[in-house]
């Protein structure tokens, strides 16, 4: 793996010092899965537990499509070797991601009813007009918190990449 996204910034006022910090992913990574959780005023409380996150993938025809190619890609086998059970697993994941689309976290959707907020009964998960969308969220905030902002763990990934303290960035 030779490609990735890197960023750098001079961070001030977080108590860790006013220095240039670098983050991202190359051969090593400085991020973990999950979103940044803030209070009502926008203050960072911490980050979501990485175990609560994955790459969400939706396609508009998930319920009716032949998913053998998707299953072959997922399992790393030839299409001719795909089993009905493997197709069922892939279809089940599509269904889960469709029904649990994280629009509230920033995942794109087609606002069919035009009300400006995601409504799972009418709106379509994924990038508007796309046949398929893959979406994920990652951050470099080490403190892991629950929805109430209570600490549940700590996972510092930023120093793994160039030894820098975290910036406090979320990538979607």
What is the predicted function of each stretch?
Residues 1-172:
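A long-range scaffold signal marking pre-active-site subdomains of enzyme folds
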